[in-house]
């Protein structure tokens, strides 16, 4: 709950109240919570950083990837199982975070119908990357070769279409 921004010192936050007002299982609320998890929870960040959208990854290969990243084998197996639990919740079914098969894990392009979720993702990205001037070109979101402290919202949400981004950004500026 803390990593999702919902609980601070055993009390619900203003963010939790906002999510409650929106409806816990709405795409908007799920998107906002997942954005917080992406930037505050190392396990969710690992999924984003290491699993590309639309690619099928054998669960055993994902375990090997985790072990190569110095995760203990037992923990690696647990992290792979946790992905299925996440995708079985509204994060997977409503937000479209991803899905699993018997053998594979897949991360999916999010369903984001509320541009405020994208705006929040951009805000958290800028904050995580300590970008004081808060200015960057759209191409910066797509460049995955840049070493930075936070995952690009393009990678996080699986939105790699420049025209889709332009439409979203124009919608935000209206």
Question: What do these predicted regions represent?
Answer:
Residues 2-174:
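Donor-sugar nucleotide-binding helix/loop cap in glycosyltransferases
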């Amino acid at each position: 709950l803390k990593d999702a921004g919902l609980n601070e010192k055993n009390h619900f936050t203003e963010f939790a109240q906002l999510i409650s007002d929106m409806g816990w299982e709405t795409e908007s609320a799920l998107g906002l919570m997942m954005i917080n998890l992406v930037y505050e929870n190392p396990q969710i960040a690992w999924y984003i950083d290491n699993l590309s959208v639309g690619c099928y990854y054998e669960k055993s290969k994902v375990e090997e990837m985790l072990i190569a990243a110095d995760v203990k084998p037992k923990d690696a197996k647990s992290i792979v199982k946790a992905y299925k639990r996440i995708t079985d919740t509204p994060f997977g079914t409503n937000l479209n975070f991803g899905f699993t098969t018997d053998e594979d894990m897949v991360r999916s392009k999010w369903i984001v119908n509320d541009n405020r979720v994208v705006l929040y993702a951009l805000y958290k990205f800028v904050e995580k990357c300590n970008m004081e001037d808060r200015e960057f070109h759209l191409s910066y979101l797509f460049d995955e070769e840049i070493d930075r402290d936070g995952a690009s919202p393009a990678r996080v949400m699986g939105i790699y279409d420049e025209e889709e981004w332009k439409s979203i950004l124009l919608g935000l500026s209206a």
